[in-house]
Amino acid sequence: MKRIAFLVLLMASAVTAQAQDRQEGAKWATNVCGECHAVRPGQPRSPNGRAPTFVELANTPGMTSAALTVALTTPHAGMPMFVLTSEQRQDIIAYIMGLKANK
């Protein structure tokens, strides 16, 4: 019985940590990415018409956390390289992946 209670508490703390990561990710995304991307759900278009919305990114077929890590750490045309800590990057990725329609 103690083992089950421990597992329930462990799972609950993991869910809480994920929610906090996403909240932090939303803050970082707004500050760092919001100039070009529509960061929040409900924003129909990005300020930069060539930049996808975060909802579009999250729902791109095959999109994974690993793919977003590559995108955020590899220079590519049209997107500046931001200096983010690993934790900041992971929080932004958690936020984007949390926007997936079929979680």
Descriptions of predicted regions:
Residues 49-57, 69-100:
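Axial heme c-ligation environment in periplasmic c-type cytochrome domains
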Residues 4-13:
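Sec-dependent N-terminal signal peptides
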Residues 28, 102-103:
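Short sequence/structural segments immediately N-terminal
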Residues 32-40, 92:
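The canonical Cys-X-X-Cys-His
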Residues 14-28:
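Electrostatic cytochrome c docking/interface patches
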Residues 42-43, 63:
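Short, non-ligating residues that shape and space the ligands of small metal-coordination modules
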